[in-house]
A protein has these predicted regions:
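Sec/Tat signal peptide C-region and signal peptidase I cleavage site
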Residues: 16-20
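Sec-dependent N-terminal signal peptides
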Residues: 4-14
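Acidic, serine/threonine-rich low-complexity disordered tracts
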Residues: 21-113, 156-245
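Hydrophobic, well-structured mid-protein blocks that either form specific transmembrane helices
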Residues: 107-146
Length: 245
């Protein structure tokens, strides 16, 4: 009898999981840097693997690694994992973990959330917060991690047509992404944005008003909302993120 019950339970478990509505998507992006007269050069590769389950849960695995000359000057290679929920057609993290090697130093950050509030933070190694501009617990409320931010930026509908500002905290830095304008062009839609630094930046190097001169996020159109690229300019330096197709 016990054996029969076990078989029935196993069969039901298998059927339920087989019928789960899952969506998997792998994508790859390249970050380029460009100076005047000099062709753009790829300096960073971002790989993502997104799994959505029953339109209620999501799992985002990602890898970030430096390329070309940057890999020799200041190499970075890291893997991350975000587990979260999908509500109101948007992504909200429940946990964020990022482990990476910068040069010869291994580092990691772990953030856990509950009801959009941070309930746990673990850093390896620990860093001296006294050298950084302060961040209060209240300023961490309703924040998301940078990987979830990137995931939202890939779909114009996830940023509500460029009409909602986003609060970000990566375990050290706290900043806002503020959308200011949406423009229809012959190539699609361009969203203008800026960064407002709240805290967690080096005291001797931070200017509260410092930001890129120009930030644009580009989408094909509002119908399919396909991400076309990210463009930023600060002084003579241009930063471009494009998807590899």
């Amino acid at each position: 009898m016990k054996k029969i019950l076990f078989i029935v339970y196993f069969a039901l478990f298998f059927i339920n999981n087989s019928l789960a509505d899952t969506k998997a998507e792998e994508r790859e992006f390249i970050l380029y840097a460009k100076l005047p007269i000099v062709p753009k050069i790829s300096i960073l590769q971002i790989s993502t693997n997104l799994l959505e389950i029953d339109k209620e849960k999501f799992e985002l695995k990602f890898n970030i690694k430096t390329l070309n000359i940057v890999n020799y000057i200041s190499s970075v290679n890291g893997d991350g994992l975000v587990l979260g929920i999908i509500k109101s057609n948007n992504y909200y993290p429940e946990s964020y973990k990022y482990e990476y090697t910068r040069g010869n130093k291994e580092k990691s950050v772990y953030i856990e959330y509950s009801n959009e509030n941070i309930i746990k933070e673990i850093f390896t190694p620990q860093f001296d917060k006294n050298k950084l501009t302060p961040i209060t617990n209240k300023q961490k409320t309703n924040t998301i991690d940078p990987a979830t931010l990137f995931l939202r930026l890939l779909d114009i509908n996830k940023i509500y047509g460029c009409n909602q500002d986003i609060k970000i905290y990566d375990g050290k830095r706290r900043y806002d992404v503020i959308f200011s304008d949406k423009e229809l062009t012959k190539h699609g839609i361009e969203c203008s944005a800026s960064q407002n630094r709240i805290g967690g930046f080096k005291k001797d190097k931070i200017d509260p008003l410092t930001k890129a001169d120009l930030v644009k996020i580009r989408y094909e159109d509002s119908t399919n909302s396909r991400f076309l690229g990210f463009y930023a300019k600060k002084g003579l330096i241009e930063i471009i993120i494009e998807e590899v197709h």
